[in-house]
Amino acid sequence: MKMITTDLIRGSLKTIVLKLLKENGRMYGYEITRSVEELTRGQIKLTYGALYPVLHKLEKDGILVTESGNYNNRIRIYYSLTEKGESVVTEKIREMKEFIDSLQNIINPQPGLNHA
């Protein structure tokens, strides 16, 4: 399978991160990248250069909170959703589903629909 391009990922990254945090409670950066890679069977590989700016923006916007933890004498920064984040993730998932449906209409048009 071919990897999905960076351009396609960039527009979806916020929703991907929010959905993972909703499902897992709290996660650290490397854990997020590994989960995405596993769930997509290697088709999506997040770089830290793409992930961390999104995490920092979501934190700045009050959608995520951070918590430091110590693991094997290493500091890990865990991210989790705020109450505001819980409502934002629901909206982002709805938007993404609508977007995917719209793309399906373009890629595989239904017979009889007006394509003008």
Outline where the language-model segments fall:
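A cross-family signal for key residues in well-ordered alpha-helices
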Residues: 19, 34, 56, 90, ...
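Short, Lys/Arg-enriched N-terminal segment that forms or immediately precedes the first helix
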Residues: 1-6
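Short beta-strand "wing" residues that participate in macromolecule-binding interfaces
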Residues: 66
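N-terminal helix-turn-helix DNA-binding core of bacterial DNA-binding proteins
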Residues: 7-50
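Basic, amphipathic "hinge/linker" alpha-helix immediately C-terminal to the N-terminal HTH DNA-binding motif
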Residues: 71-93
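Basic amphipathic alpha-helical segments that dock to polyanions
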Residues: 51-58
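Amphipathic alpha-helical dimerization/coiled-coil segments
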Residues: 87-116
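Glycine-centered, phosphate/nucleic-acid-interacting loop/turn motifs that mediate DNA/RNA or nucleotide
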Residues: 62
